């Protein structure tokens, strides 16, 4: 029996076990950095499988499991993120979140369950492994600021890793379909803050003021011009001004106006070109009117998630042995799996869960987000298959 | 001795008395509708002058004094507003405000003192009066919403009034200079609120949202086009967008965006044309993108302050007997003295207090606003002179 | 019989004569600098009245008549412009223009006829004149560039003039009503040209170009912001972008874009503030994108037309003896009578010709513009009356 | 010897012959629909090679050659376009264009030479062909309006064709590199014209006009918002406003304003969404101000060029046997080879000619565009190889 057949049979035995783990985590969602019970469940489950476990790797709730093969080989890391979102669950699944205002609305509960399933398969087929399989259970992917990957990497989680793989469940693709692409697959999220310092005054006498709202209008228009005119239109790219706040009263022109937003790009040149234009636009337009300004970009944001082309070609062939694999467009969301890919070649890929019949049609982050649990076994299978294949390269 | 000489002499006697009243009020500023101690001081002072006093006219802190001439004649109303502003005084006068965060930054303390000075002169020259002089001490001019004039009028303060006059101290004109104009002199302040209801979503996928901030940009640009293209450029007119609020997080496009501001005009046709355009702009631009919207104009705002042309011609001649009188440009601030002028012909005029030597250079509403007290006697004199002249018409 | 009664009777005798002169000129309209037959008619008519005539004063078609009083007195200049407009007349008067594409659409034919009528009255009442009455028949007011006034002034036409008056017929006011105002009455027309030099390229690859049209959009939006935010909203002021030209083909982004327009203001500070902002806006916004630019303002344009306040007060009283006189809003059109007013105190005023019953309802410069000829005698009368009164001051 | 080796040897023999043909055509460039001498040269050359020739296929200058295999098989079409551009050549090659203002600035001369080279190879290896190889020499690709492909198709050129291939030389890729991609590779060029009909008037009185330039500003801003906010930012997409014309004089607001430009997209849904928004934007914004408008999209423009995914996979493997093959980003230029791909599966691909050492660095359509002639044999080889492989499928 070939490897795929073997693993397919094995995963059938534990399908329900995987689902139950997922539901338990779904009922007890925990926000970024507070994944205490989830990480405890992971550590216990790994230990029950006889896997070497290290807790608190870089972060209190970070867990790493290690399965060593009987012969030398490559070190393959498999990653699952664990945190939930500040969303009030409105879907009516029986295992609905029991925590007010917190929900696994992005499927990280399924990621943990699928990787524990993969761990089970790997332990059961330990003889097929070479080198080391490193199971990374990462907190705080949704944090969007520092993020959980960075501290784990600083704590050495990627030392000696030859390949790294990560799966994300997504309602953008049909149930059971794997979707990925070579090169950049997810964007870097350059959060920005623009503050215009004008000089307030009476609403009836704008000429005696430096009107920060009017200036912000000109800046915002020019910023949207960056997308429409300055960036290569073939490049996936977007700037969104997502907050604007200024003023208190209808007859008082305020002193200051503040805008925040995000620049999403998949290319470092495009990224720096956009930021340069933004700085020039803000300072030049403020200069016209004698206003002063601040333009701040959040530092050390998640990098661009770049799939290694050769690895991706190979993985797509491997995965096509267990399901349909499609080449997807890039996504302008962001993922700190990108930091792992900066340390070792690997691939980040989506596992589709969209199933009209089962009502699994809502986008990730929606309060009605729901998952076709039939796909979970495929995730576990993919983890195990890649671990075995690449550890033996 | 002619009337002017007589009154000039009389006012010299009480100049210091007027100044002390002003300083007492300045030290104890009271916000709109809470002018308790100021109105008590007014009522007591009027009674000491033997003047018939009515308190609580339309508002608890409103005070009206009546001086009746010995022979029939016209009823002339003289008005002074009493409220202070939510401003922290930073000027270093010895009689600085003793109330944290409250200051007579618009000179209403001087208005009360000057009208009490005028009352003194009228009592002293009672024989020269015909008909009735009605002294209106009005709360809450700065309120900007309902305002104190309206309830006083509804309580009958303007019943039977033939002429009405009001003075406002202003650092826009040189000390002692009277400034006014025929026809519209101050604007109506149409406060507006625009709410754009879009559909929020992820900052990286604007195409899946109805972006209320982007829509508000287009609306704001078109609104400023009303001033630049749709309103007669000879007409004093301004629209100011003074607040804009939308969004909470750099990567989330919000559902809604809210803007507030003010339309200032001196002409009813211009006013309704501007409001029509604003409604059309907001609904049309929202319509392009499938957003819904609300456009609200505050109701029953202060009317346009319109000086009666004939009365103004006559008053300018009278005042030129006691000081320099200039014809001023209209001002796009607002005043609820306009409501009194809707009930009887009259005139609203400024008394200059700008004096570089004395450091009286800061604009009204400034935390450093200060008054050249030498002009106060002129205000009292003007009140008395107009009362006598017009009561005898 | 007083002066006004005398002149009223005299002008009745020549009313028809004035109307016939007007109609003759109306049938033979001549464009700026080409008023050959009109100026010939003027010279002949003056000579027939025994008036001393000088032709070619500064311009070939300029004519000056001089009537000297018997006793010393003031020199009073009265001015009428003579040129027509490049407009195809579509009104159906029997004395319609006989010249294709040229029409007296702004009433300069009536100005000539009224001043010749005034000359007749002055000759007839020569004894009432002191000093000298100087009749200025000026070419090329409509030229908008150099204009006819400047060369005539350089040729000495205003040497020794004490007062100068000019009438303009206008359908903005009711028939027979005089309208004027103290101070600035007409604007200075700062014509501007903005050229943005970008770098063209393919319409599908804007990022490889410096798109002059996009840049011009930002500039134009900011320019309209000058009106809405930077200039005192009480000041009559307008900027109009009246031409924009760029590009030849739908798939080629051009190199350059050119805009023209006009700034109209009644105040030198406002004027220079607007021009400064325009320069800063164009250079700053071009600077953002690496474009270069030119901002040119036409030189030596017609100045602001400023009526002398004292003279205006006096003239309004004089004119009220022959008709209704109203104080008008300023007009943002331009007039090179302004150059005469820079040389001597005087007044420029409108004579209304709007008459619904007679169908005289079209605005000046309209191809259907028509005049209520009953008012022409009033214009002649006004010229004579002012000449007599001010020459005797 | 395998097929590739055989063809490589054969093409060496005729490399110079191919280059000479190219240079002859380069010296005698002919604009769209006027490729008389080029098509004569093609017909003669084909006949000399013993190939069945048909001239005037749908267009006078269109030429089709047919090479029939000895055994049944597939019909494979190979296409080369023939027209030059209205560009004055400024490159200093010895075989520079001899026709003023006309130049082969896009390499269509090389396309003809490479396809004639391919024809030579196919005739020489006729025994390896099955079915039919149809050589399409197409006029007027650069025309951008109707284009040459459409009439040839209507004349039956694609009847019975099983596969179709087209090569385009491009300085965007290194010399000798083949570049292509599955799915959409070039855009559909929706040329648009927007006319705003307002109501002109005097530059000083915009409120009496419906200002078409101001309205066009609002429209243009909103149009660029389509790119920035309404279209999926991952989608290659651009709108360029490339011409704007309005107005004649600095003091006259014109009646009308006209804009032209192009929408480039690779997806029919995106394309129709953009056009819908454009219509809504123009009509809604015109509606605000009472202007009327026209929005016209050029009809029957070149479709999206869509490479058949399966054929592309196969071709990329075949071509990798003779040179480097890279997967390229889509290009937002347009090509009427797209019409051939609507009739039969096939692939359009680029052949790189960028060679710094040889100074071949200028973009297509540049007056300095020049080609590294060493690559021409590769193009001939590719034509022959694909014809043989796919005719035998």
Swiss-Prot record, chains A, B, C, D:
Q: Which residues form the active site?
A: 302, 373
Query: InterPro entries under this entry?
Result: Amidohydrolase, Bact_exopeptidase_dim_dom, Peptidase_M20, Peptidase_M20_dimer, Thermostable_CP
Q: Which cofactor does it need?
A: Zn(2+)
EC number(s) reported in the record: 3.4.17.-
- GO MF term set: carboxypeptidase activity; hydrolase activity; metal ion binding; metallopeptidase activity
UniProt: Zn(2+) binding residues: 104, 109, 245
Superkingdom, natural source: Archaea
Q: Which Pfam families match?
A: M20_dimer (PF07687), Peptidase_M20 (PF01546)
UniProt KW keywords: Carboxypeptidase, Hydrolase, Metal-binding, Metalloprotease, Protease, Zinc
Task: Give the GO terms filed under biological process for this record.
Answer: proteolysis
Question: Member of which family?
Answer: Belongs to the peptidase M20 family.
Q: How does it assemble?
A: Homotetramer.
What this chain does, per the entry, is described as: Can release basic, acidic, aromatic, and, to a lesser extent, aliphatic amino acids.
Q: Which NCBIfam families match?
A: amidohydrolases, carboxypep_CpsA
User: What is the protein name given in its UniProt record?
Assistant: Thermostable carboxypeptidase 2
Organism this protein belongs to:
Saccharolobus solfataricus (strain ATCC 35092 / DSM 1617 / JCM 11322 / P2)
What gene, per UniProt, encodes this protein?
A: cpsA2
